[in-house]
Regions:
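Thiamine diphosphate
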Residues: 1-27, 78-81
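Short acidic, glycine/serine/threonine-rich loops at helix termini
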Residues: 2-5, 28-33, 105-110
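Glycine-rich anion/phosphate-binding loop at the beta-strand->alpha-helix junction
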Residues: 15, 24-38, 49
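Structural motif
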Residues: 15-19, 58, 66-69, 92-94
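Glycine-rich beta-alpha junction loops
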Residues: 23-25, 75, 98-104
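Conserved thiamine diphosphate
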Residues: 34-86
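Glycine/aspartate-rich loop-and-adjacent alpha/beta segment that forms the canonical ThDP
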Residues: 85-115
């Protein structure tokens, strides 16, 4: 949701901190795959994701973003330091926060899981 706006914000270097809580699913729609879902992930219904995930950091770099970082929600010390750096950056800052969804995406095969 909002990938088109993401691209335009980055390309125009709008001074904003763009934080993505990246868990690979749309939890409010009962766990549908997001654009960042791991290939091979399965919904509880058994449907498998056959698409490669979009790498938001890679996309931001490709679009010319001058501040790009990735962190993990379970590491608050690192996350806080990155958030402070992003807020002091002049221009677009993209922070991709891997944030596990324990309801719909908590399995050993997920890169966005506690398991």
């Amino acid at each position: 949701i909002g990938l088109g706006q993401f691209c335009h914000i980055v390309r125009r270097n709008i001074p904003i901190v763009y934080i993505v809580e990246n868990n690979g699913v749309y939890g409010l729609t009962k766990g549908q795959f997001s654009a960042t879902a791991d290939k091979g992930s399965k919904l509880k219904s058994g449907v498998q994701n056959d698409l490669q995930p979009i790498d938001l950091c890679g996309l931001a770099i490709e679009l010319g973003c001058s501040f790009v970082a990735r962190s993990f929600a379970g590491d608050p010390k690192q996350l806080m330091a990155l958030m402070k750096a992003a807020m002091s950056h002049k221009g677009t800052a993209v922070l991709d926060v891997i944030s596990p969804c324990v309801t719909f995406n908590n399995h050993e095969g997920s890169t966005k899981s506690y398991k």
